[in-house]
Structure formats: structure tokens, C-alpha cells
Amino acid sequence: MLSTVTYAKKVKVEKEISDREYWTQMAYKIAAPVLSNMSKGELKKNMQVEISPTWDGRSKDVTYMECFGRLMSGIAPWLSLPDDDTEEGKMRRQLREWALKSYAHAVNPDSPDYLLWRNEGQPLVDAAYIASSFLRAKKQLWEPLDEVTKQRYIKEFQLLRRIDPPYTNWLLFSAMIESFLMEADAQYDLFRIHTAVRKAEEWYVGDGWYSDGETFAFDYYNSYVIQPMFVQVMQTVNDHKVILHDRSLEMQKKTEDLAKKRMQRFGMILERFISPEASFPVFGRSMTYRLGVFQPLSMLCWKDMLPKELPEGQVRNALTCVMKRLFAVDGNFNEKGFLQLGFAGHQTGLADWYSNNGSMYITSEVFLPLGLPASHSFWTAKPQDWTSKKAWSGHEFPKDHAIHY
């Protein structure tokens, strides 16, 4: 038998890493297989596509735009940070270089990785996430593209007007695309923006929640789409001082401010959903979107908009522990490093009829706080227990009350 001392010497002691190091390593792990392949025009060649057992029969080629668009929307803020010679900086620079080449392949009809822009309705969804990535990191991800590539994007975005979105969260996909066209100084359709804004306002049901269309559904689409995209659209329109029909800029600014306050309330609800054990409730459709659930909370962190009830160290600790718990489960990734269908691990039966493993990359939206530099207080603040952990440990924690705006 080995002595205790001898055995201890044989055990590899892993260096304890910071929360930020864990986040960046996980973001790189998710992004690298996608971008390293797509930068060479080899994503379609090498990505193992996995579709839901109840797939509706649409072209499986929608997978690649879902994968690329959702990934880039989540990591764009991180890639917008300036270069440095740290290990993180090297990863970030490599991903950005791959991403810029991938953006070009996505709209080049002669590339093997030209995405499915002109068939099916699904491209409206994931083009909106590509537009989101450009809005979130315009200087680093849009401006360096050559003029031919930029014009190709503008054309593809405009051609998506062929799709008549249903009166659900899909209206915001159209609005996101048109908002980016506004940002890019291209021809845009203000009616599509205004329609989405009007309907989002109508669909607010109270206490930080919007319905997804006329009827309320208890799911996480407030996280995946509605709240972040509504705020992004209003910010873009107001930044450009474009007046929507029958409104004033002052009215629109109030709409933006109100949407942000409601997102703060929703962020508080999401934080309270996190159990003492760092799990969160599994309900509603699209549960395979994993940590995309926390996009509003992550966006509040990135934009320095956390409400006073949520200290930065508390939110960072909560999100880190949830991330570690979920990704510690075997089966989240396949042998080539691509995400698989499932929530915690590989659970194909959870996938909805519209889901493929490209859809899973919306989990990247949790990484928005990486857009804050390592020196920011979000990353340096002392970790604190989150609300439910305080509550179930017998410690003081804030009371909770509904909002009425």
C-alpha cells in the first residue's frame, strides 16, 4: 500500500482559480470549437448536428446560424475588451480573430459556411442575435469587417423582411435587426420597430413580467428574448433620436427607463430563483437553453444596472456556483466539444420540436459580465451568499415586494 504521504504526492493538486478565470475558461471552451472551425469555413463540415426527437422537419441547416448567432451575442462584450498579454487576453484575441473571419464566411455565398439566410422562418430569430452581437461590440466586431462583408450583412438583414413574424416575442427579432440597420446607417423599417415596442408595452402583465403574446406563459422567454431585446431596441432608437409614430423623444426615454426598471425587478426574481444549492427551477419550454435563463441578470451586471438589493459579489457568486454545478455534469459536450441537447448533461428528450444543438448556444448569454474588465468591482468584490442561501442559513436577507410600474 502507498503511504499517505506518497499517495498525496501522486495527487495532482489543481491551482485554485478565480471566478473570472473560471468564467473565461468556460466561455472559451464553448466558443472555440465553433469559431475555430467556422473561421476556416469548416463548421458545417465538422459540427455534429443533433436535432430534437420531435423535430418538425425544417432544414437542419438552421443549426449553424443558431449556433453562431447566439454564441456571438453572449461573448461580444468580452471580445470588446482591449488586448493585453494575459492568458485571458490571448484567449480573447484568438476568439476575436476567429470571429471576424467567421462573420465573413456567414454571408459569403461562395463559402461552405454560408448560413441559411433565405429559406425557412428561423433565420429571423438568429439574425437578431447576430445583430445583437454587432450592437454590443460595434467597434470590435462590425467596424473591422471589409465593406463587401458589411454590405452583404445589410442585404441579408433587409431580405429577412420576407418573414411575417407572429405576434409573439418574434416581433422583437424584427425590431433588433431593424435597430442594427439604423445603427449601421442603412435603410431600416421603422414600422417593424414601432410595432414591437407597442406590443411589448401592451404585453406587460406586472411585477417585472411580460407575456409572450396575448396569453401569459410561465416560462423563461422574458430572459431569452423579451426583456434584453426590448431594452436594446429602445436604447438604439433613443441614441439615434429617431422618433416613433405618435411619440416624443421624452416619451421614448421614459419607455426605455421603465423597461430597465422592470428588468431590474426581473433580475431580482431570477436571483431569488437560485436555491441554496445553486440550482434553479426547471419550468416552461426551451429548458435546454441552460444558463440563457440568466441573460437579464447578466446584462444588469454588465451595464452597471444591478439594483441596490443585489450586491455585485453576491450575484457573481450565485452565477458562478450555478455555472459550476450545471457544467460539472457529464454530457453537456460531445467528443468534439460542441454542446449537446439537454439541461444538465445530455438529455435529448427535453428538446422541443424546434430545438437543435445550435439552439443550445444561447447559454452563452450568461457571459455578458465578462465585458467588464477584471479590475471592475463586479469581479473584485468579496463573494457573498445569495438570497436563498442566506434565508435557509438563518441569516438576515431583504424582504421582497412587488413593483407597480
Tell me the role of every PLM-derived stretch.
Residues 83-87, 142, 241, 375-382:
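Structured alpha-helical bundle/scaffold domains in large eukaryotic membrane-trafficking regulators
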Residues 7-56, 60, 77, 81, ...:
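Terminal, non-catalytic domain-edge segments
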Residues 64, 75-78, 92-244, 248, ...:
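Aromatic-lined, polymer-binding surfaces characteristic
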